[in-house]
């Protein structure tokens, strides 16, 4: 299992997502995510289909509500990122043991996958939506004053399953 977090967010906030084109063209506005997905597709060819099916799924639910979109986005994005960077497989290739490993991971993610606070996925830099290097798929859920001390002492932190 990979120790470092070596992925980028795939899908932006609801307001941005609903205005984007469907297909791989969506990534044109997110150069870091585009580069990440293309790099993954070199070793996992079905990753492109994973991305497109997930995008279509999110698009179909984005019209219901922002909260529904955010909840679904968080869960499916975590699955895609885990499948591609930890299991090194397309979601299409996952079997029961893989899913059991994923569920274990979600309940105790690698520390590199856990941020110390909820962060925006992207930042506008030079007019482009660039990856926020502080974003992680999971966020610590501890008191602010205890967070720095726990991390500086090398302790793990409780993760939040709440959307961000």
Residue ranges and their predicted role:
Residues 1-77, 81, 90, 101-104, ...:
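Basic/aromatic DNA-contact patch characteristic of tyrosine site-specific recombinases
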Residues 53-67, 77-164:
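N-terminal core-binding DNA-recognition domain of tyrosine recombinases/integrases
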């Amino acid at each position: 299992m990979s120790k470092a977090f070596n992925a980028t967010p795939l899908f932006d906030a609801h307001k941005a997502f609903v205005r984007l084109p469907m297909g791989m063209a969506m990534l044109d506005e997110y150069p870091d995510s585009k580069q990440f997905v293309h790099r993954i597709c070199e070793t996992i060819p079905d990753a492109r289909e994973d991305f497109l099916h997930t995008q279509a799924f999110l698009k179909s639910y984005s019209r219901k509500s922002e909260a529904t979109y955010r909840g679904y986005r968080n869960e499916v994005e975590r699955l895609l990122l885990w499948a591609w960077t930890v299991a090194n497989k397309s979601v299409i290739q996952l079997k029961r043991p893989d899913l059991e490993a994923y569920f274990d991971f979600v309940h105790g993610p690698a520390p590199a996958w856990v941020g110390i606070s909820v962060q925006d996925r992207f930042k506008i830099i030079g007019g482009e939506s660039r990856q926020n290097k502080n974003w992680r798929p999971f966020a610590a859920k501890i008191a602010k004053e205890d967070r720095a001390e726990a991390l500086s002492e090398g302790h793990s932190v409780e993760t939040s399953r709440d959307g961000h």
